[in-house]
């Protein structure tokens, strides 16, 4: 039986003794040894050793040759062979992917790596250190940790193993809802400091900033504080009581008015400091913390004050140029009877949120009733769009804070459609095969966290961020079981998938094609529900944001299938279930088109609309928000808020394949402009940190969602 040789790239090839003989002869020539018979004898001896086995690797063969030569009469030949092997190893290493990727980072020539994440400034040293660590982590995971078929599927573009630069090399998870309430009320240890419960709102927000930085350095996805207005309200009360005590001690007239005024100022300043802190922090991951604040449901004076402070600070902007803050992402909850309609007690806060959205794009909105209907309970998304399902503790209480998502594997749906060549039956068969592979990949994420001790991330597991206080040697995997954590199957390109399968008519214009798109997502949902039942883990379906993936999948498919009209010809794939960005429809019809998908993909979703400048037409924006309240759980507003510091222009810069330019004066100096775009579920500043080529092309093609030039 001929043994197989395991090559360095993982491929298996038949063993050939001729290859050994050729290598020895080359070394003999270099050493000045003219003895072909001896070389052939060495090759035969080594071959006989290898033939006794079913599988060998390259290193074993080379070591056997070296040993044989060292025991022979030609020591210079042995030395020449060893040197030859060493030189080949060096040349191979230089040509290898790891070396090439490191060189691309050092020389700043690998644009795909440098622009992969719009939140990472690849020009600065901390980010470059993170990117370097990511290159090594990816390489090690591909070579030593992940199953070969999973790696090959990722490399081909059948699936995408998200955040391979962090996991599974490190036992990290994706995104989470921090249990801020538990940490602030019970106290915790961070570094060398014992943190006691704060005694004022200013201290509470300062501690919150440190918690965000620590947590964001221990996970690779988004960090969310759920219902922050209600969580921090007691610390506003603490501040009020301090100011009231001061007024009484100094016998200040109108002590009540004084205390409220001082508290309002302190609260505003506290959230201003928090916003600046978040936008100036750099985590160990080489980026600004990707943090989300959920708020809007609090009814107390203190909660309302926090809501107003968050919004007014965002409206004010950052620095002397009043630049739009990218983080925190703001998510404002709307609930009928609270702040939805005129006459509701918090309706004035909604008006402030509308003003803020028109000027700063955030907040996005969570429609309370729809969120409960789709996900089973109300909560803020983790990161930009990942939603937890319902989970109850041993006391039957619904728990959200302290829970997390373990990671995502996304399917390349357009590729399956291209492989099916218009055959719908073949598509469904291939889809089932890819689903089995995706499940295998997702299970590696779970397996990586088994046996991990709490001491690897004290802030998460020992100090309360995950809602638990484990001991250093406790196994963390228990808190991820029985649906407490989610783990998600993602997908991309429903629009291109339908085009590849059926061609012709636009998906939006055909009820039959719409049904086909929904059927695909229904099949994905059936799969994750089945996996959840079979494993007990919280598998969910997630509508992948696709910042980098929209470019990567399309690029790989173009190389494999060529430029296919309606599929690969644009240079990007459409995010998840979203309407084609070039399709001009009014915002209400876009909401109607996308509304069937969140109930199916309830592990992650967002809907949004593109608008002109609506700062002077807030009633029109409110009309769309109100329409969304009845139809979708989570809605975002994209409006032109670019600014030119040369000529004073505010509005929308011209987007080209190369960047952004002021339409009034032609300025495109990144230091003299502010350009803000929604990357996927969050905002980015592409003037300072460019998008990848696919995302830039997608942004360039976006049209405004207007009906006959009007909203409302």
UniProtKB/Swiss-Prot annotation:
Regulation of its function: Activated under anaerobic conditions by NrdG, a tightly associated activase. Activation involves the formation of a glycyl radical at Gly-681.
Reactions catalysed: a ribonucleoside 5'-triphosphate + formate + H(+) = a 2'-deoxyribonucleoside 5'-triphosphate + CO2 + H2O
Annotated Glycine radical domain residues: 583-708
Modified residues (Glycine radical): 681
InterPro entries membership: ATP-cone_dom, Form_AcTrfase_GR_CS, Gly_radical, NrdD
Enzyme class at the top of the EC tree: oxidoreductase
GO annotation, biological process: 2'-deoxyribonucleotide biosynthetic process; DNA replication
MF-aspect GO terms: ATP binding; metal ion binding; ribonucleoside-triphosphate reductase (thioredoxin) activity
EC number in record: 1.1.98.6
UniProt keywords, alphabetically: ATP-binding, Metal-binding, Nucleotide-binding, Organic radical, Oxidoreductase, Zinc
UniProt-listed SUPFAM superfamilies: PFL-like glycyl radical enzymes (SSF51998)
A single cellular component GO annotation: anaerobic ribonucleoside-triphosphate reductase complex
Domain of life: Bacteria
A UniProt-annotated Pfam family: ATP-cone
Residue stretches making up the ATP-cone domain: 3-92
Binding positions (Zn(2+)): 644, 647, 662, 665
NCBIfam families in the cross-refs: NrdD, PRK09263.1
Function: Catalyzes the conversion of ribonucleotides into deoxyribonucleotides, which are required for DNA synthesis and repair.
Description of how the protein assembles with itself and partners: Forms a tetramer composed of two NrdD and two NrdG subunits.
UniProt family annotation: Belongs to the anaerobic ribonucleoside-triphosphate reductase family.
Protein name: Anaerobic ribonucleoside-triphosphate reductase
